[in-house]
Amino acid sequence: MSQALTENRTVTSIEAQKAILKAFKQKRPIFLWGPMGIGKSELMQGTVDSGVLGNALLIDLRMALMEPTDIKGIPFYNKELGLMDWAPPIDLPTKELASQYDTVVLFLDELNSAPQSTQAAAYQLVLNHRVGNYVLPDNVVIVAAGNRETDKGVTYRM
């Protein structure tokens, strides 16, 4: 029987911010694990407010409160196409909105507290920068965050 290896690293907020900025430069998503109340959301807001990203916008989505359709959108009949189509969700950045900023940070907070079906929809955004017909604008970077399973909060294994 094999044991799963879990590696935890404790970092200061300055070290976390440096890792976040490095991930942003590489256009790579990052996941912040930590206990409830440690300041993951505040760290992201502070990073955006610091000006280090230029003119930046933080879109903070609380994933535990979302359904898969909040990410993928809702299907509707498109008369022009004669097919089913998707109405994109209002919470995700449009190209028009993103064009007003140097960087848009899409913060998927409480991701591992979201139902697994919602997590699956979010994974499409994180891994492919798209979900359904919706495509993230090029200047959008993704940060996800969640609580550790060991903290006995509401979490689902990822």
Predicted regions and their residues:
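AAA+ P-loop NTPase catalytic core and its hallmark functional loops
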Residues: 2-158
